[in-house]
């Protein structure tokens, strides 16, 4: 009986494999825009969920503190005064937690954008490495033919083999980096490590346009949810000094001083981070301009080479070499522009703007209003 079942299973195996292949072919490939990726990530983020729960907890504490005030008659007593202060502190704490939740969401969104773009960068590198390998393979095959006809030396053939092995290693490394980039991204958006979603958003390159750095610094300070929360924490600590039943007045004074120092330090850190970020963005923009020149030169060189090949003055291998050079130049430019987009995302976050531009396909909209 077992033998018969085995025969039946073996007979059905090709059909099962074909069915599985057909099902895989019919399974639609997951496509994700940047906006969709952010929405998925926020929905499964533990840090965001924790911040939300802390906000909810603070809301309950605020409501309970307000309820306790109803238990007191409208007369003055240390207990009544204490209850009013605790209610005020609970109110402040709720708003602090709300702002910290906002900060967590903004920071997490910035991270998702970075991981999304990192996948695009890794894809570019893997594609460029693949094209380079194709050229190296062509050169290796040509070297083998030349060697078999006694046209090149054994050392020249060995060099071609070494170049091929090196190109294979570069491609393997690029594929590993792509796998790592996908793994990092998939973790954020709640996908399995083996998933390879198609990231369909086009990331525009929009140079930074700043008219007044001081205004940008002030904007960053005025819109920072972390700084807002730190400054409200000072107010909360000041109320401790008014309490009748504060555990230690001296400790409360020190805690207030520490809160004030933290807020001042945060203000200076925001200024420092913004200035460094602006410098880095402008530096990348200079590199982008230089890379654009290299792409243009590579395009012109390839265009001229195609003409020479048509006239029989250049070989296919020489033209392929220029094609790979152009692909490499474009990949270098794309990577710089992607790096710039990551920095601009951090810039929008730091200055309180919408982290995602209203339209990712309209280069005219930079989100810096």
Task: List the predicted regions and their residue ranges.
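Long, charged amphipathic alpha-helices with heptad-repeat/coiled-coil character
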Residues: 112-115, 241-256, 273-280, 285, ...
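Periplasmic alpha-helical coiled-coil/stalk elements that build and connect Gram-negative outer-membrane
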Residues: 60-68, 79-86, 99-101, 105-219, ...
